[in-house]
Structure formats: C-alpha cells, structure tokens
From Swiss-Prot:
The chain crosses the membrane at residues 33-53, 66-86, 110-130, 148-168, 210-230, 256-276, 286-306. The keyword Kinase does not apply. One of its GO terms (cellular component) is plasma membrane. This is Vomeronasal type-1 receptor 43. It is found in: Cell membrane. Disulfide bonds join 101-188. Glycans are attached at residues 175, 201. Belongs to the G-protein coupled receptor 1 family.
C-alpha cells in the first residue's frame, strides 16, 4: 500500500499485507489516525473558507494566495479520501468493487502529487516575491493568476497520466486466496506488474519527487540567503521599536520557510522509513506509524498558514474571549 498511497523512491509496492495481519485489530492506531484526519479536515476547511470569502469580498490577492487556497483544497480532498480508504483498513471489509478501488486509489495518488507540486510552487513564488529588482526572478513578480492556473492544470494532467497505470493494476480483492497479490486495503489489491513497467513507473515517480524537492530546497536556500543579506544591511540602523517589528512579508516568509523545511524533512523521513520497512520491518505496526506520519504535513499546514493571517488570529481570539466569558457567567 505504501507505494500506492505514499510513494517513495523505493520499490513501487512495498507493503504486502496478508489476511492475518489486518490493521483493524488495533483500535488505538485507527483512533489516532482518524483523530489526525479530523483535525486536518477542520483546519483545511477553515483556511479554504477564509480564502473564498476573501476572494468574494474583492480583496486584492497576493501572489501566494491562490497556491495556499489551492493547497488547502487539495489537502482537504486528500484527507477525506484517506479517511474513506482507512475505513477499509482499520474497521471492516466493505466489499468494494473494481471501480471504487480504482477511483479512490487513483484519486489519492493524483492529490498527493498535486500537494507536492503546489508546495514546491509556493516556495518558488515566495522566492520571486523577495527577489531584488536586480535579480533575474524579478521579472516574474507580475505573473498573473491565469499563468499560475495554467501551470497547475498542466501538472494535474501530467500527474493523471503518470498515475494512469493504477487504473489497470488496482482490482477488488478476490475471494480466492493467492500469494500473487499485494493488499492495499481489505477490499482492494494490486495485480503484479512486470519488471519493466514497475521500473519505469518507479523511475518517473522518483524523478518527479527529487526534482520538486530539489526545487523547494533551492528556493528555500535562496530565501534564507536574501534574509541574511537584508539583516546585514539593516544592522547599522538604530534598534528602534519600528525596526524590530516584523513586516508582513517577513512573517509570511518565515511561515513558508518553516513549512518547506517541515515538508522536506517529512518526505525524507517517509523515504527512509519506507525503504527500511520494505527491507526489514514489513509489518502492520510499522506501516501504520508511517501512515500516521505522512499526513502530518496536510494536518499541520493550515494552522501554520492561519497563524500568519491577522484577521483569523483576531477572530479566534475574540471567539475564545466570548467562550471564556460565557463559561464564567
């Protein structure tokens, strides 16, 4: 299942789960996972609603507003699909047919790819925003939302094509016991692929992942370098209250830097643990830990973004004060 839902550069399908090692026997793991999913769905729904209302009210959008809103939508859909799939892992066999299995796993793969792509795009856009006028990136500062949407649409189609082999390899688990199938959930399995097809697909996924992560790393390094240069240039200024106050751009930059670093670290962790689990610890418990860890970014990211939005922070503070006052009275 790991290489269908949570793809790493290791062997394409690394989790072989037989019928005697079902994860639904451990209710604590399932409850923890569904709690994480619930928190993530709440946070992404709130962030998406905020950006929709912001657009309806006619606020001038920042260059990063569209990717952030899109990322919240992607994570919301991804977590919903993950929760639906998880019911067939932790709870009971639903008896899904081929169409449901193919649709859910294929949709999840595409959403995971779009999450990686949008996160990478967000880091690049932030680097463009901070780039000085003398930089070659400054000419992209006036890029329109139309171009961003076209890029996202192109990448969406590309990911759909790359993942299209899942529409063939994913099937409903037959009643006949066989050792040739890799179990994705209790209802869905993977048909064995030829060595050539598996190698090509693994190579394409690895190239895509390494390219986008490298792009995030370079843009993050560029942002850090710009911030260090800016700090050196302002060191000679007198340390007044005004100079110590963070600008909105600096706050947004620090937020995105933190998320990019967290995303890269979680991706590296997923790759390492997935490879080790494939070679050494191919058991349900280690798999369930990985299942929990790789959704942390989608769960945490909306709250990090919202912490940088003054309107949301002020709204939550006022709501908190009202609840405290109601409890006191």
């Amino acid at each position: 299942m790991s290489k269908i839902l949570f793809f790493s550069p290791c062997s394409l399908f690394s989790h072989t789960m037989n019928k005697n090692s079902r994860l639904h026997t451990n209710s604590n793991i399932g409850n923890t996972f569904f709690s994480e999913i619930g928190i993530g769905i709440t946070g992404n729904s709130f962030l998406l609603l905020y950006h929709i209302l912001k657009f309806i009210r006619g606020h001038r959008p920042r260059l990063t507003d569209l990717p952030i809103g899109l990322l919240s939508l992607i994570h919301l859909l991804m977590l919903l699909v993950a929760a639906f799939i998880a019911t067939d892992i932790f709870i009971s066999r639903r008896g899904w047919d081929d169409i449901i299995c193919k649709f859910l796993v294929y949709l999840y793969r595409v959403l995971r790819g779009l999450s990686l792509c949008t996160t990478s795009m967000l880091s690049v856009l932030q680097a463009i925003i901070l780039s000085p006028r003398s930089s070659c990136l400054s000419k992209f500062k006036h890029i329109s939302l139309h171009h961003i949407l076209c890029a996202i649409l192109f990448l969406s189609v590309l990911y759909m094509l790359i993942s299209s082999q899942l529409l063939v390899s994913i099937i409903a688990t037959p009643n006949l016991t066989t050792n040739d199938l890799t179990y994705v959930t209790q209802s869905c399995s993977i048909l064995p692929l030829s060595y050539l097809v598996e190698s090509i697909n693994s190579t394409l996924l690895a190239i895509r992942e390494y390219f986008l992560i490298s792009l995030m790393f370079l843009s993050t390094w560029y942002i850090v370098a710009l911030l260090c240069m800016h700090r050196k240039q302002t060191q000679h200024l007198q340390e007044t209250r005004l100079s110590l106050k963070k600008s909105p751009e600096q706050s947004a930059t620090q937020t995105i830097l933190m998320l990019m670093t967290f995303f890269v670290l979680m991706t590296i962790y997923d790759n390492i643990v997935s490879c080790l689990r494939t070679m050494l610890l191919n058991d349900p418990t280690s798999y369930s830990i990985e299942l929990f860890m790789i959704h942390i970014y989608a769960t945490v990211s909306p709250f990090v973004f919202m912490s940088n939005e003054k309107h949301i922070v002020n709204f939550l503070r006022s709501m908190g004060k009202r609840m405290i006052n109601l409890n006191l009275h």
